């Protein structure tokens, strides 16, 4: 409590639970989907005083730059699938995870030869490069590498959410067919 009072904000913790060797082994498992539990702080103002985890700004860029491009631990299509359709199915997120008519238009346009993470533990507030466009719910959030200021995102809950009328925490067998 003294640390929280002295700091005047949230106190974060970074745990080192997996070796790089284990990360590479798990990356090769085809049923592993990718995600992040890190917050997305703005790299400006009061947020620059926080000690964010480097993956706050470079998690997915690191996946593409290190494990796809450099190590060839998985293919580009497999990485994209495991960042989109697979987690959407795992979390029962309706109308998400695919580029399909009637689905929410959440799209990231990047150059697979240039995408790169730059954040480190000593300098965590470094944005990734190689991402050109980000479209959230059909609206540009990043256009030609520049943030637009649009706030078109929304909180998304799958069927595992306790308030869901559908109930359940996994996609049905029928829903799984389209991801493989």
Labelled PLM ranges:
Residues 24-31, 36-37, 41, 108-154:
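C-terminal cap of metal-dependent C-N hydrolases
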Residues 1-8, 21-114:
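His/Asp/Glu-enriched, well-ordered alpha-helical/loop segment
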Residues 176-180:
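Tryptophan (W) side chains
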Residues 12-17, 91:
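Active-site glycine- and acidic-residue-rich loops that bind
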